[in-house]
Amino acid sequence: MKYSEAEKKLKTAGCYCIEDGSRHPLWYSPLTHKQFAMSYHRNEEIATGTKHQISKLSGVKL
């Protein structure tokens, strides 16, 4: 799965970007009330461990 595909799923679930950091954009999930980092490289594949971490923090199955 690419970051762009994950971003679409997260936006559909209500997650949104709260800050464009210098290294990674920070996102917020209203489902879990937690923040998590994404990547600016939208065309790259997400590593398996990173995908699981984003899924866990966001509450959205990727």
Placement of each model-derived feature along the sequence:
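Basic nucleic-acid-binding interfaces
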Residues: 2-20, 28-62
